[in-house]
Amino acid sequence: MEGISITKLLVIAVLIVLLFGTNKLRTLGSDLGAALKGFKKAMNDETPAAKKSDGVEAAPRVENKE
């Protein structure tokens, strides 16, 4: 059992290009890139908001000592 060789990957890539065409794949790639960029931006924008305090401090944690 070899797994997937480079020739098998190339054949799969050629079949995908033949089925969908280069224009459709280019559009799909740019849409995927824009989605990832938006996701990363949203994650970076959320981090400072989570760190910002509202002036309310959390109560210290109390452990049960028996």
Swiss-Prot record:
Transmembrane intervals: 1-21
Chain intervals for the UniProt region annotation (Disordered): 46-66
Family under the similarity heading: Belongs to the TatA/E family. TatE subfamily.
Membrane topology recorded in Swiss-Prot or TrEMBL: Single-pass membrane protein
Coiled-coil stretches noted in the UniProt entry, renumbered to this chain: none
Disulfide bonds: none
GO cellular component: TAT protein transport complex
Protein name: Probable Sec-independent protein translocase protein TatE
Keywords: Cell inner membrane, Cell membrane, Membrane, Protein transport, Translocation, Transmembrane, Transmembrane helix, Transport
InterPro entries for this protein: TatA/B/E, TatA/E, TatE
Main location class: membrane
Domain of life: Bacteria
Keyword Transcription regulation: no
Claim: Transmembrane is one of the keywords in the record: yes
Function summary: Part of the twin-arginine translocation (Tat) system that transports large folded proteins containing a characteristic twin-arginine motif in their signal peptide across membranes. TatE shares overlapping functions with TatA.
GO term, biological process aspect, one: protein transport by the Tat complex
Protein's cellular compartments: Cell inner membrane
GO molecular function, one term: protein transmembrane transporter activity
